[in-house]
Each structure stands twice: as C-alpha cells, then as structure tokens.
Curated annotation (Swiss-Prot):
This is Chymotrypsin inhibitor SCI-III. Residues 10-61 form the BPTI/Kunitz inhibitor domain. Disulfide bonds join C10-C61, C20-C44, C36-C57. It holds the Pfam family Kunitz_BPTI. SMART domains: KU. InterPro entries: Kunitz_BPTI (IPR002223), Kunitz_BPTI_sf (IPR036880), Prtase_inh_Kunz-CS (IPR020901), TFPI/VKTCI-like (IPR050098).
C-alpha cells in the first residue's frame, strides 16, 4: 500500500510496520493514548506516522 498521504501524519494509523522484515525502532503517534510510542518498523511501505526520535514525534504531534 502507498503511504496514507490524504490524512495528516498524526492522524494516520499508529505503528504501521509495513511489509518488509527490517528491524528499526522508530516512534509513532498513538491517537488512543495521545502519546508518541516506540514501535518496530520493517523498512518499507507503512504510512508516514513514523519518526526517528521521540522528540521529533512529540514536536509534530503533541501540542
């Protein structure tokens, strides 16, 4: 699937790992908990709700 670009990044699904089998610890905004949380990204596809650092996620998604 293509990234979900029609929704704002912080409203896209939390922790979309994608279809590949890499192992990258990234951060994603979780709308249910209203926090940025760590998840494992597979390295391809998924959506745009993924950030390299907790600070980057919080800066973008937590007001």
């Amino acid at each position: 699937d293509e990234p979900t670009t029609d929704l704002p990044i912080c409203e896209q699904a939390f922790g979309d790992a994608g279809l590949c089998f890499g192992y990258m610890k990234l951060y994603s905004y979780n709308q249910e908990t209203k926090n940025c949380e760590e998840f494992i990204y597979g390295g391809c596809q998924g959506n745009d709700n993924r950030f390299s650092t907790l600070a980057e996620c919080e800066q973008k998604c937590i007001n």
